[in-house]
Amino acid sequence: METLKLSALPEKDKQQPISHGRFEAYVDNGGTVLAVAGKDYCVIAGDTRMSDGGYGIQTRKYTKIFQLTKKCVLATSGMQADTIALQKRLKSMLESFEKEHGKPMSTPAIAQFLSNTLYYKRFFPYYTFNLVAGVDEQGEGWIWTYDAVGSHERVKYSSQGSGNQLVIPLLDNQVAKFNQQIVEGNKDVSCEQVVSFVKDSITSAGERDIYTGDFADIVVVDKNGVHWEKFELKLD
């Protein structure tokens, strides 16, 4: 009996390797957020570019800063869909808290609640990297910085996102005064000076990071509330 060889079969009848479409649950839409806290204020910045994870730009007008209360904002980079889901959850819980207690949640309490929320989702986490910035009950400016599963730290400056490695050295040098041989004594820096520095920082990140650009939102949080400003970055 003649044996049929595989090589004798028509090309269409040969068994082809089975390929599976890989499901990617997450995409990093890029962008940069940063914040600097002063004695009685916080300055937060975030660009408005949303990329598709590659070289495409999906929109140039996506704000990464979300106001939580009159004394607190959330700045987020990462996946836009998860960012929106997280914002909705926080907004719902803050509204419920205010209705039940008759007052808005304090900034430190919001920071802890966000940590709990992210940790609760740790087995399928929100692909978001967050900064909570605002003033506390004593009127002092603070920032809380997070990883994706809720580990957080209270600091005076921080950044997140695709331009993080470009911005952090500037913040280390100019805010914390690291790697300087001669450091002046502690002195209060005006909010206007910090705003100018933050603008320069995110502009610098936009020149080197293709996922950061178009426009930047600058937000100042102080005892009088939340104040917004927008300025243009590179558009290419």
Swiss-Prot record:
Function: Non-catalytic component of the proteasome, a multicatalytic proteinase complex which is characterized by its ability to cleave peptides with Arg, Phe, Tyr, Leu, and Glu adjacent to the leaving group at neutral or slightly basic pH. The proteasome has an ATP-dependent proteolytic activity.
Gene Ontology BP term (one): proteasome-mediated ubiquitin-dependent protein catabolic process
PANTHER family recorded: METALLOPROTEASE TLDD, PROTEASOME SUBUNIT BETA TYPE-1
The protein's assembly and partners: The 26S proteasome consists of a 20S proteasome core and two 19S regulatory subunits. The 20S proteasome core is composed of 28 subunits that are arranged in four stacked rings, resulting in a barrel-shaped structure. The two end rings are each formed by seven alpha subunits, and the two central rings are each formed by seven beta subunits. The catalytic chamber with the active sites is on the inside of the barrel.
UniProt-recorded name of the protein: Proteasome subunit beta type-1
Subcellular location as annotated: Cytoplasm; Nucleus
Disulfide-linked positions: none
SUPFAM superfamilies (alphabetical): N-terminal nucleophile aminohydrolases (Ntn hydrolases)
Domain of life where this protein originates: Eukaryota
